[in-house]
């Protein structure tokens, strides 16, 4: 029997963890596990500064002039109330991915995950007529704690919005869904954040690593964790409407689900996001202005 002291055991555990973290930085998981899948984000040229902000997008991305654009203001009293025959059903969000990265794509912080084809989380039921597989998660924030969400509820903003992107099952990539131009090709579930005095310990898995991606174009691996740690699943009491991406190419192929019950975040945690830089300096605001609802209906699934 091997005798080992507590201090030696702790050193051993720390060494194993360090080796694991180093491996996540250098390994190409798609080569190590050919069946692993990661959602690659198409690259489009845009920004939020005067020279490349939303008022300039229409010059390069004609879809941004469409009549079903996002984000919108949700007038809660005008929402059509629906009693669904079945709840939203979430599968796999309580499991950890093979690997996880955060990226400064020069406009947002993007959380990407890699899964085996059999373990990728998906959502179905409720307002959905298709199955949607997880893709990417995108954070939006603002100059202050009074703004930062792209969507508004009765013209009230939250300090941050997390958009969880999904692809309709059958498409091989986000780019395939964009190219197909099916009006239900993408599902984005938005979660909103509310300032609290205490840090949200679950968000710390991301926040404590933001200093590593301050420079534009940087990407780092972080220890993987279940997505359920940063946003809760839900079955009912959500808003939904048909719209577009809130960033180029602004394709009108998105089913939006908005969860109005906010997630806790502290002022100091939000402040770490404002240190992220683009080529124009710190990203202090990365939200598109709300768009006209026009003839669309917004539904509330009770």
Show the residue positions of the predicted features:
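Alpha-carbonic anhydrase
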Residues: 2-302
């Amino acid at each position: 029997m091997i005798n080992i002291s507590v201090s030696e055991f702790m050193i051993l555990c720390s060494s194993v963890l360090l080796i694991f973290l180093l491996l996540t930085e250098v390994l190409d998981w798609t080569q190590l596990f050919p069946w692993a899948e990661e959602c690659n984000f198409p690259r489009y040229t845009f920004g939020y500064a005067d020279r490349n902000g939303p008022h300039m997008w229409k010059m390069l991305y004609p879809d941004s002039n469409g009549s079903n654009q996002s984000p919108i203001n949700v007038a809660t009293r005008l929402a059509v109330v629906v009693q669904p025959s079945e709840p939203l059903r979430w599968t796999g969000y309580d499991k950890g991915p093979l690997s996880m990265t955060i990226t400064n794509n020069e406009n947002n912080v993007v959380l990407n995950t890699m899964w085996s084809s059999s373990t990728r989380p998906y959502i179905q039921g409720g307002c959905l007529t298709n199955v949607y597989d997880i893709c990417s998660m995108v954070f939006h924030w603002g100059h202050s704690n009074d703004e930062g969400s792209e969507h508004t509820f009765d013209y009230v903003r939250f300090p941050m919005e997390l958009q969880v992107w999904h692809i309709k099952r059958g498409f091989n990539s986000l780019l395939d869904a964009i190219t197909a131009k099916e009006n239900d090709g993408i599902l984005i579930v938005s979660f909103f954040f509310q300032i609290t005095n205490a840090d949200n310990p679950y968000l710390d898995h991301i926040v404590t690593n933001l200093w590593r991606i301050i420079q534009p174009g940087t990407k780092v691996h972080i220890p993987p964790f279940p997505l359920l740690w940063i946003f809760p699943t839900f079955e009912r009491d959500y808003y939904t409407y048909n719209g577009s991406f809130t960033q180029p190419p602004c394709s009108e192929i998105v089913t939006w689900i908005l969860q109005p019950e906010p997630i806790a975040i502290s002022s100091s945690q939000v402040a770490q996001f404002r240190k992220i830089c683009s080529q124009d300096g710190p990203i202090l605001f990365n939200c598109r202005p709300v768009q006209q609802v026009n003839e669309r209906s917004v539904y509330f699934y009770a």
